[in-house]
Structure formats: structure tokens, C-alpha cells
Curated annotation (Swiss-Prot):
The lineage of its organism: Bacteria, Bacillati, Actinomycetota, Actinomycetes, Micrococcales. This is Chaperone protein DnaK. Induction: By stress conditions e.g. heat shock. Acts as a chaperone. The keyword Hydrolase does not apply.
Amino acid sequence: MSRAVGIDLGTTNSVVSVLEGGEPTVIANAEGGRTTPSVVAFSKSGEVLVGEIAKRQAVNNIDRTIASVKRHMGTDWKVDIDGKKYTAQEISARTLMKLKNDAESYLGEKVTDAVITVPAYFNDAERQATKEAGEIAGLNVLRIVNEPTAAALAYGLDKGKEDELILVFDLGGGTFDVSLLEVGKDEDNFSTIQVRATAGDNRLGGDDWDQRVVDYLLNQLKVKGIDLSKDKIALQRLREAAEQAKKELSSSSSTNVSLQYLSVTPDGPVHLDEQLTRAKFQDLTKDLLERTKKPFHDVIKEAGIKLSDINHIVLVGGSTRMPAVSELVKELAGGKEPNKGVNPDEVVAVGAALQAGVLKGERKDVLLIDVTPLSLGIETKGGVMTHLIERNTAIPTKRSETFTTADDNQPSVAIQVFQGEREFTRDNKPLGTFELTGIAPAPRGVPQVEVTFDIDANGIVHVSAKDKGTGKEQSMTITGGTALSKEDIDRMVKDAEEHAAEDKARREATDTRNSAEQLAYSVDKLIADNADKLPEEVKTEVQADVDALKKALEGTDDAEVKTAFEKLQASQTKLGEAIYSQAGSPDGATGAAGAEGAAAGDGSKADEDIVDAEIIDEDEAKK
């Protein structure tokens, strides 16, 4: 049975983990890092770059490099590369494919099953888009799990037998969640982890802190009469510098942002050298920090607990490393210190791997009960939002309610599904619409239409409507207005596979070119260093092959390079044969070379000098 992996598909960075012997292990990527930047780039030659290599080249390839695509999941966002439009799902799939490949390299086997995490406050369309990204990447998505829930799973399994409340404060690169979970164990050491309440903001994360620094630096330049707000290259360099400054200010009280030749104006080059203190940084971002308070208070209120009831506070997401964040959490929690014993970058992926192990039967000692983050309902007369499933309801769940017609002899009803907490549907998120037709003619208020909402364990919604009078039924899986059809997903899977094959071919061609250059250089040097020892015909033949390879390397035909490379690989052996035959002749070189020549050229003599014996310990022999 193939193993399943757990994937934290983050806005800024992503992580993959797997269970080994029942315990989670974070898998390092091909570059040696335990986190992989969620950055995808299309090089001008057509190669798709993912991760650290994509991030490093961003400043020179701005329009073809995509970062923070997670913020576009579940929307109709697209990016145009060479006339082809890519959806957020397709770009995310590239990151997932890299994580999948790195896991396969580590495990030495194919990986097809995965648990992927999403922010707890992701709506239905965003969850569906994440599942589709996994499918495009060639993964069978076993489960979509909320990030704070996964973190609590990783943190809470080693807790004692008493029921304990864990508050997870998750501030990532692009999203923010707060969740309260109850963790308990029975006498058989079986753990139950149940989400009590969750709240969040899908438009708040470390990227916003970075942007405040970028805006500040742009304003500092504007004061000097320099406007770089439209300079894409300068903006990318500023973004990278802002992210680095944010990280440095987590451990230092001040940092220096120094960017030489940031841009060029008619007056000459623009250099930036600006000191940024932690106090100034916190002042620039204080309103962002303020936005984390309401979700925190909402969770405490919805769970109906006191702050003193919280046993553990876990910080998740790289952005929680900012001192102002951990100080605020301590303040909000009534002075309780957050736990510092977990890696905020890795704990979500570790929890996802544990859940993958549960679903595959590798772990049988835990039950995870999640909740739906937002209320679900339909539009009724007057545009009213009528809830069928309230937020923070444990999932999977199923609810039904009976509605009637608004007009006499109404032949059909439109079922419009919404997600949100507002009183009117216009203020909530529309998820989809379908129509139930064939209702028997009757005065208004007489027909009975039963609407059923069914939320699966992934948090994805299925809705059905049934006319109790005629028995007619209509149903749909809510996939959001921007979800992909089965045909779209199949096409994108095929496209991704083709790209993977192209990328592999390109890598092989590059490796061949590198090896060919090295071979041409070394053979050239060997001929030059041993010119007096080589017969003219051998020297001429091999040199011709070297020259042919060099000429092929100047061109763009990879097949020609490969052919010339293989030809030189074969012919260069004649050089060694000629050199060693010279060394073995009576007037040739003696010593080490001569001995080596004898070993290589005179097998019978060498065999005569070999004594077949074994070593015996004298003391052992006497026993």
C-alpha cells in the first residue's frame, strides 16, 4: 500500500510530511530546504520553475513569476503567459507537483494520496479549488483539513488524559485563523480532537506587513522627488528587501535596508539606504495587528468559555514570529504565554501527515472532528438569508428544511445557495444556483419543497431539493461560480503531465550539455598534456571528435550535442589505451605508470603474483 503525504499548501511557503513508523517526518526538498517557496515562474525558454529557484529569479522575470496565488483560490483570477491563461488551481498545482516529486525522491516510491490543508476560514469555492489543484497535480486528495485543526492534531496527541482546550492562532503569509479545539484521551489512549469554534480573515497575512514596508520605502523616496511606484523591477526588489527586514526585526531592534542601483532616472542611478526600527515597523502595521483581535474574541464568545479555561496556546505560521504578534496573543489570552515548543512553519504539515496516516489506517488512535467555518443557507422571499447549517457545526453533517412557493401555480423554484453570516443574501457569498422544475400547479403556500444540505468531511457542500408532492428531485455539488468542470480538470492534468515531461527532457538536455562541455575540456587537456605519447592517427581522430562536440555545443540542437557527446565518449578511450601501451613498452615510462600498465594489460602475469590464502589468528588456531 502506497503511503499518503500531508501537505501544507501555504501562501508564502509550502511543506510536505509523511509518517515513518507511525511518526511524522518533514521531507526536505531537492534544494535541501524543509520549506518550499510557493512561487512558480515560466522562464523565457518555456521551462516551469518552482520553489526557491523561481523565487531567486523573480526580479529578472517579474511578469512571468507568480507568488501568493493562494489569495486567488476560488476566484476567476487568471494569469496570461505567452497567450495561455492559467487559473489559480493550475499555478498551485505546480507547487503541489514539486512537493509530490520531492516526496517520491525521498521515499523511493510513487505518491498519489495526500491530505492538503486550507485556512479554517476558507469558503466552499476556495476549498473546492484547492482540491482541484491537487487533482491537476496528479494527487488523490483524501481529505481537505483546516490548518489550525492539523496544528492541534500535531501538538495535542502527546497531551495527558484530561480534556484540554487548545487555542491555535494561525497567522500565515496571506491568511489568518483562530481556532479553539478540545483534545482528550480515553483509558485506551485513544485521542479525540474536536473543533469547538473557528474564525478568521482570509485577506490578512505576512504579505500585508511586507507591503506596509514597501509603501513606507516608496514614500521615503518620494520625499526626495523619486517615484518608483510604476517601476516593476524596483518594486520586486523592494518587496524582497521588505520581507527580509521584517524577518530581521523579529530578532533585532533595527535593521538597514540598503539597495544599490535600485533604479535609474534622468538624474542618475537611485540608491536606497534606509534604517528601519522595530518601533517604526510596528507603528506602520498596528492596524493590521488590530484586525486579529475580533476573530480571537469571536472564538472565545462562540465557544462559551473563559480565557482561564484555555490550557495551551499554539502559534502557527511564520508571521507569528513577529514579537508584536506573540505579545498581542499573550495580552488577548489574559497573560498566558503561547507555547514556543512547535515549529510554526512545519506543524500544519505534520498534522496533515498524521491525518493522512489515520485515513490510510497507519494510525488508529485518533479521531478528528472539524467544523464548517461559515453558515450555509438559501435565499427566501425578500432576499432573506435563511440558514440551514449554522457556522461551527461539526462536519460531516446533513440538514433538511421544507419550503413552499411564493406565487400561485408556480411551476419551479430556484434554489440559490449562499455562505455567510449576514441577514440578507446580497451581503453573503453566493455559492451556486439550481432549479427544481415540474412542481404541480397549486395555490402559493401549498407545494412542499424539501431542501437538504449535506457537508462532507472536506467541508464541501452538496445540496438537493425535492418536491414532496411529485417526488421530483434535483441536486448539485456546490463548486462555486469559478470551479472547474471535470473536462477542465482532465485537460489541466494532461497539460501538467506534458509540462513535466518537457521539463524532464530539458533538464536531461542541460545535464548532457554540462557533461559534454566538461568532457570536451578534459579530453582537450589530455591531448595537449600527452601530445608526445600519442600516435598521430589517434590524436587526429579524437581531436576531430572534440572539435565536432564543441561546434555542436555552440548550436541549439540538443540531439546533435548528445550524438557528438556519445561519439567522443567512445573515441576518448583510445587515448588511454595509447598512453598506457606507451607506458608498458621497454622504452616507456617506469614506476607507477608501468605497474598500472602491467595490471591493466597483462592479466596472466598479475594472476601469477596473487596468493590465494586466508589470515588465521594464531591464538584462535590453538583453541
